[in-house]
Amino acid sequence: MKFQMIAAVLLIAFCLSVVVTARMELQDDEDMKNGSFQKRRTCIDTIPKSRCTAFQCKHSMKYRLSFCRKTCGTC
């Protein structure tokens, strides 16, 4: 029974990671088409509170170390 629970949790975690990765890649493709691909990666001090959702904050942190210092300052 324990093994089945562990297997179920691992399967759910794997599925969630695949969904999140696919969503982030889809967002990057949309940015390329819209021309905002470079804007996202330019250094900004803060994200406006209107755009500061948990997903937006997490997604912008992806580029934090190589491009910016405080991309999610208002989150």
Swiss-Prot record:
Which stretch is the leader sequence? 1-21
One molecular function GO term is: toxin activity
Report whether ATP-binding shows up as a keyword of the record: no
Q: Where is this site: Important residue for binding Kv1.3/KCNA3?
A: 47, 49, 51, 60-61, 63, 67
Main localisation: secreted
Where can this protein be found? Secreted; Nematocyst
Domain of life, source organism: Eukaryota
Going by the UniProt record, its keywords in alphabetical order are: Cleavage on pair of basic residues, Disulfide bond, Ion channel impairing toxin, Nematocyst, Neurotoxin, Potassium channel impairing toxin, Secreted, Signal, Toxin, Voltage-gated potassium channel impairing toxin
Q: Where is this site: Key residue for binding both Kv1.2/KCNA2 and Kv1.3/KCNA3 (occludes the channel pore like a cork in a bottle)?
A: 62
Q: What positions does the domain ShKT occupy?
A: 43-75
Residues of the propeptide region, as annotated, are 22-40
UniProt family annotation: Belongs to the sea anemone type 1 potassium channel toxin family. Type 1a subfamily.
Its UniProt miscellaneous note says: In PubMed:21339955, this protein is called kappa-TLTX-Hh1a. The TATX abbreviation is given to this protein, since the abbreviation TLTX was already given to a spider family.
Q: What is this protein called?
A: Kappa-thalatoxin-Hhe2a
Organism field: Heterodactyla hemprichii (Hemprich's sea anemone)
